[in-house]
Design a protein with these regions (language model features):
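Short alpha-helical "recognition helix" segments of helix-turn-helix
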Residues: 47-48
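Helical mechanochemical/support elements of P-loop NTPase systems and associated helical scaffolds
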Residues: 18, 58-61
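Histone-fold modules and their flanking histone-like tails across chromatin and transcription assemblies
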Residues: 1-42, 90-110
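C-terminal engagement/docking regions of AAA+ P-loop ATPases
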Residues: 51, 60-63, 67-110
Length: 110
């Protein structure tokens, strides 16, 4: 499974502006898990630069994507991805961390 397949499995589709941003950031976090500690200083600006948009746009569209996932996904699968039971909507950083970690556990380190 890759990042795109995972997002689609979580009820997120390619019509959301944040979809491509999320795929890009998940790949960055898979390569460097510590990147989630620099979400506003590294991940958002790097993603914004890559897509030619503002950091604020990346953050806002990620929030929408995470909210969509929270309201549309199969919660049991979302908990499996997170590795724990989620009682509330994850933050953007937590979402990126848990999806990248899930993909690493699935044997997709690249």
């Amino acid at each position: 499974m890759d990042a795109e397949q995972l997002l689609r499995s979580l009820g997120i589709n390619g019509t959301l502006k944040g979809f491509r941003y999320a795929i890009y950031m998940i790949e960055l976090v898979k390569q460097d898990p510590a990147a989630t500690t620099l979400i506003t200083k590294y991940l958002y600006p790097e993603t914004a630069k890559h897509f030619g948009v503002s950091s604020g746009s990346v953050e806002r569209n990620m929030r929408t994507l995470v909210r969509t996932c929270w309201t549309r996904s199969d919660r049991a699968f979302l908990d499996e991805v997170a590795g724990v039971h989620l009682n509330c909507q994850p933050s953007n950083g937590m979402f990126l961390d848990m999806t990248a970690a899930f993909l690493r556990r699935q044997g997709n380190p690249d």
